[in-house]
């Protein structure tokens, strides 16, 4: 039945995203990082071809950032991921292609090494001394 398929998909995502320990917890009782993982899981339950993420690392501590970055990296093997993110170490670690915007205009695009070396990007996002 449809409910059986939904329950099976839910169990698969819970295990895939490392939420098994929290299976019987209320979402409100989860840590901030685990709540973000749950948000990703609810989106993945719909099996999208493209996963859109807006600042997925915002407000997270280093440990949660590493956990969520790993999940996004794994998810990206099965679908396209479009992510807005200001944590440059995460961008460097996860992204194959980077587009930098400034005031709605494309400032630079390419792989992280190319984009991060662009003087306009360095001035705009990393400061003049970067």
Report each predicted region and the residues it spans.
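Glycine-rich phosphate-binding loops of nucleotide-dependent enzymes
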Residues: 1-130
């Amino acid at each position: 039945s449809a409910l059986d398929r939904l329950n099976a998909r839910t169990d698969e995502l819970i295990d895939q995203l490392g939420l098994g320990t929290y299976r019987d917890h209320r979402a409100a009782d989860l840590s901030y990082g685990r709540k973000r993982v749950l948000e990703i899981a609810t989106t993945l339950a719909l099996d999208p071809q493209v996963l859109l993420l807006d600042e997925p690392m915002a407000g997270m501590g280093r440990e949660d950032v590493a956990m969520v970055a790993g999940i996004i990296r794994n998810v990206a093997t099965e679908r396209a991921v479009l992510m807005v993110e200001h944590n440059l170490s995460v961008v460097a670690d996860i992204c194959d292609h980077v587009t930098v915007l400034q005031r709605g205009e494309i400032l630079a695009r390419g792989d992280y090494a190319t984009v991060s070396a662009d003087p306009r990007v360095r001035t705009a996002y990393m400061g003049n001394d970067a």
